[in-house]
Design a protein with these regions (language model features):
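Conserved N-terminal catalytic core of the sugar/cofactor nucleotidyltransferase
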Residues: 1-5, 13, 27, 31-105, ...
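Conserved core of the sugar-phosphate nucleotidyltransferase
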Residues: 111-181
Length: 181
């Protein structure tokens, strides 16, 4: 199984805390955050990872050249200008070995059973499957609105009363993206 980790962001909200590092290399204990994400992927059976890197990409490449995760093939897709999620995927499509792959945000871990998610994906013959969460304070995040068949109807940035929730009442949806597709 292949995965693409989107690790090209500037991390402007973390700038003071990470002192010049890209946010995916933010130290958590003794290791960078991205190392925990790669370890989680390996535990899920994912051994082939493409890191889509942009901002401070040389720091990320240098770190993982020196500290290559065991049992994992790492490749890099370099963005010289920010391309966004779709642009990053378009940029690396020739690097993908197959049509089925995971995409993860490089700044969050969402504990999902990947095998169950893939089973759901195949059972529903979906083009894309998103892992969603329903945290207690969902209004603090961008929302995902679903239709009656649990298909994505809209993405809404942060809390807004512009679109109705799934139940038709005004306000933000209880669902947020887990950053795993």
């Amino acid at each position: 199984m292949e995965a693409v980790v989107l690790a090209g962001g500037k991390g402007t909200r973390l700038r003071k805390a990470v002192a010049g590092l890209p946010k995916s290399l933010a130290p958590i204990g003794k290791h960078p955050f991205l190392s925990y994400l790669l370890g989680w992927l390996r535990a899920q059976g994912v051994t082939d990872v493409i890191l889509a890197v942009g901002h401070r990409r040389t720091d990320i490449v240098r770190h993982y050249t020196r500290h290559k995760p065991q049992g994992m093939r790492l490749r890099y897709s370099i963005e010289t200008t920010p391309l966004g999620t779709a642009g990053a995927l378009r940029n690396l499509r020739s690097m993908l070995d197959g049509e089925e792959f995971l995409v993860l945000n490089g700044d969050s871990i969402f504990d999902v059973n990947v095998r169950r998610m893939l089973s759901f994906h195949h059972r529903h013959r979906a083009e894309t499957t998103l892992a969603l969460a329903s945290p207690p304070e969902a209004a603090r995040y961008g929302s995902v609105l679903l239709d009656a068949r649990s298909r994505v109807k809209a993405f809404v940035e942060k809390h807004t009363d512009v679109l109705p929730r799934e139940d038709g009442k005004p306000g933000a949806s209880k669902w947020i993206s887990g950053g795993l597709y």
